[in-house]
Amino acid sequence: MNGSVGWADAGVLMPYALWKQYGDLRVLESYLPGMRRYARFMQKRCGRWYPTAKRTGLHGEAKKYLSNCGQAYGEWAEPEDVHHMTWKDCAVPHPEVATAYTAHVMECMAEIEAALGDANAAENYRQFAMHCRKSYQALRRTPAYSLDTDRQAQLVRPLAFGLLDAEQAAFAKKRLILALEQYGWRLGTGFLSTPLILDVLSEIDIEAAYRLLENEEMPGWLFMPKNGATTVWEAWEGTATKNDGIASLDHYSKGAVCRWLFDTMCGIRVSGENHFVIEPHPGGHFTCARAAYNSVYGQVESGWQKVGGGWKFSLAIPANCTASLKLPGKPAVLLEAGTYTF
């Protein structure tokens, strides 16, 4: 693979995620030279000719900022009845995926450079990201890459990365719900979009996110333990997969759903060195939930339980920390260290 997006850009996205989680600029300073080299590599691939590239029908400025070059894994491991993957998927560029990640990485680099004090570099990355977004929007207006699709990944990704204009975004949200309804509220995403789908659905309707989470049929998270799994499978089909290339039974990618359980279901989010945001979202058929996060200051806890027609919330904030509490339908309050029940 030659710079396969979704994998190779971990060199930018991992330091970015660590900085967002812990607020430590030293991580960015340490990896900045490599991140800049990779960002430049991504920029140089835009608009280039490649022998196995699929025709997109784009020209001019739209083609100039389209990434349609190099081999890539693409979405990888979507359910077989959603997209049957063959060796050809790894032999050709994936312009929808690659342009989306190019725009996303450029936005991350803009934030990184701004945080480190280089305003000119930040603006250059921001401008490149804007051009990539416009190319992406143009691509999604073509018949071959239309937003009118049942492939959930191709709807989740642009919504998660903020790549669409207002009209396209409104259509994509409705089309995603329709795709889920037509697929029986089962997961149709692969490696790249599975970690994003519950976040996107939470923005649309939190109950839609819970409905997908609670699905026990294949493809679905709960189908695995329901069928005796003690690890996370690479393929949604597990041992029944017909593709030997994705037959691992201990492949944690789809386990990324656990982040949503922490930061949305139970609502624990780090927001600075010793400050947290606690914003739980009860829903679905769950009657209780609880999560604990071991911070450097101690354990942060957030939980909720259904009581009668309402909810009982409990939380714990370690010493020398504060938390902004945002409960459903109530104004935010700032809390000092201690244990609380609401």
For the regions a protein language model found, what residue spans apply to each?
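Non-catalytic C-terminal accessory modules of carbohydrate-active enzymes
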Residues: 127, 131, 210-342
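Repeat-solenoid scaffold signature
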Residues: 182-220
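Amphipathic, well-ordered alpha-helical segments in soluble domains
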Residues: 7-14, 101, 105-108, 132, ...
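Alpha-helical repeat scaffolds
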Residues: 169-179, 213
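Alpha-helical support elements that line or immediately flank enzyme active sites
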Residues: 12-25, 154-164, 194-203, 322-324, ...
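Active-site acid/base region of carbohydrate-active enzymes
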Residues: 21-98, 113-160, 167, 267, ...
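Solvent-exposed loop and edge beta-strand segments that line ligand/cofactor-binding
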Residues: 1-8, 83-101, 138-155, 161, ...
